[in-house]
Amino acid sequence: MTGLSMDGGGSPKGDVDPFYYDYETVRNGGLIFAGLAFIVGLLILLSRRFRCGGNKKRRQINEDEP
C-alpha cells in the first residue's frame, strides 16, 4: 500500500480555485482589445465624416463658375 493515494478520490475539478486567472489569456485579450480600439480611433480621426469643429455647413461646388 505504499503506492496508493489517500486523498479521498475527489475529482481534480473539485480543488480548482474559482478565482484563478490565466494571465496569459487575459493579457492577450487585452492586447487584442487595445489594438482594435487603436485602429478604430485612427479610423475615426482620419475619416471625413467625423470632423472636429470646423464648418458644419458644406459648401456646394458649382461647376458653371470658372
From Swiss-Prot:
Single GO biological process annotation from the record: establishment or maintenance of transmembrane electrochemical gradient
PROSITE patterns named among the record's database cross-references: FXYD
Keywords from the UniProt entry: Disease variant, Ion transport, Membrane, Potassium, Potassium transport, Primary hypomagnesemia, Sodium, Sodium transport, Sodium/potassium transport, Transmembrane, Transmembrane helix, Transport
GO molecular function: ATPase activator activity; protein-macromolecule adaptor activity; sodium channel regulator activity
Top-level taxon of origin: Eukaryota
Signal peptide: none
Disulfide topology: none
GO CC entries: basolateral plasma membrane; extracellular exosome; plasma membrane; sodium:potassium-exchanging ATPase complex
Tissue distribution: Expressed in the distal convoluted tubule in the kidney. Found on basolateral membranes of nephron epithelial cells.
Spans traversing the lipid bilayer: 29-46
Location of the protein in the cell: Membrane
Known function: May be involved in forming the receptor site for cardiac glycoside binding or may modulate the transport function of the sodium ATPase.
Disease: Hypomagnesemia 2: A disorder due to primary renal wasting of magnesium. Plasma levels of other electrolytes are normal. The only abnormality found, in addition to low magnesium levels, is lowered renal excretion of calcium resulting in hypocalciuria.
The protein's name: Sodium/potassium-transporting ATPase subunit gamma
The organism of origin for this protein: Homo sapiens
Gene giving rise to this polypeptide: FXYD2
